[in-house]
Amino acid sequence: MTGQTPLLEAKNLQCERDDRILFENLSFSVHSGDVVQIEGPNGAGKTTLLKLLCGLAPLRQGELFWRGERMSQARPQFLSSLLYLGHKTGVKALLTPLENLRAWCAQREDVNEERMMSALETVGLAGYEYSPCNSLSAGQQRRAALARLHVSSAPLWVLDEAFTAIDKKGVAQLETLLREKANGGGAVILTTHHSLHLSGEVRRIQLGAVS
């Protein structure tokens, strides 16, 4: 990676909660082709770190850079290049999986109906495209959210516990998709309690070492 400008760079990040430092002086970079797993025990700040990176939590110490520019200047470009999938699915309960995906794409992606239907079929929701999400299981609702990955052209994916509530087939499918994203020049940052079985390298950042 020598000489290559990182997609995302973090310098000297710190997170404090209830007068306890979760992490400090945290610096790392994420390049095209990277899959980066954030590790640490519960309460170590993994979700908070993802939110800091995505601008969903206030950054009180440290700096972020997107493609070599300070995040304060590059925010619009960064947001248009980001897909964030949080621990909560963000799926609207009264909408169907197709309506949810259609609404999401309307704000971010130029995707036709055929491709949306294909994405829902790929994640195992064939036959449920028109069912309200509040009638679906937790795993099916998670799959409705994961369908976004199959239509996303964003170069950076940030995923918080994306493997939650999906079956073995869905896990294998998602692992393949993440590797394909990286191999295609994108990058993935994720947290998961699942043991990843991805071909190629997975970089790991360990939290929880600060007392």
UniProtKB/Swiss-Prot annotation:
Can you tell me where the transmembrane regions are?
Answer: none
Binding annotation for ATP: G40, P41, N42, G43, A44, G45, K46, T47
Q: Which reaction(s) are listed as its catalytic activity? A: heme b(in) + ATP + H2O = heme b(out) + ADP + phosphate + H(+)
Query: What InterPro entries is this protein classified in?
Result: AAA+_ATPase, ABC_transporter-like_ATP-bd, ABC_transptr_haem_export_CcmA, P-loop_NTPase
Query: What region holds the ABC transporter domain?
Result: 8-210
UniProt keywords (A-Z) are: ATP-binding, Cell inner membrane, Cell membrane, Cytochrome c-type biogenesis, Membrane, Nucleotide-binding, Translocase, Transport
The stretch of residues making up the signal peptide is none
Q: Which Gene3D superfamilies match?
A: P-loop containing nucleotide triphosphate hydrolases
Show the SUPFAM superfamilies listed in the entry: P-loop containing nucleoside triphosphate hydrolases
Where in the cell? Cell inner membrane
UniProt EC number: 7.6.2.5
Q: Which domain of life is it from?
A: Bacteria
Which top EC class is named for this enzyme in its record? translocase
Single annotated GO MF: ABC-type heme transporter activity
Output a single Gene Ontology CC term carried by this record. plasma membrane
| Topology in membrane | Peripheral membrane protein
- Report any one BP term from Gene Ontology: cytochrome complex assembly
UniProt keyword annotation of Nucleus present = no
Q: What is any Pfam family matched here? A: ABC_tran
The answer on whether this UniProt entry bears the keyword ATP-binding reads yes
Q: Return the PANTHER family for the record.
A: ABC TRANSPORTER I FAMILY MEMBER 1
Q: What quaternary arrangement does the UniProt entry report? A: The complex is composed of two ATP-binding proteins (CcmA) and two transmembrane proteins (CcmB).
What is the recorded function of this protein according to its Swiss-Prot or TrEMBL entry? Part of the ABC transporter complex CcmAB involved in the biogenesis of c-type cytochromes; once thought to export heme, this seems not to be the case, but its exact role is uncertain. Responsible for energy coupling to the transport system.
| Record-stated family | Belongs to the ABC transporter superfamily. CcmA exporter (TC 3.A.1.107) family.
Return the protein name.
Cytochrome c biogenesis ATP-binding export protein CcmA
| Species name | Hahella chejuensis (strain KCTC 2396)
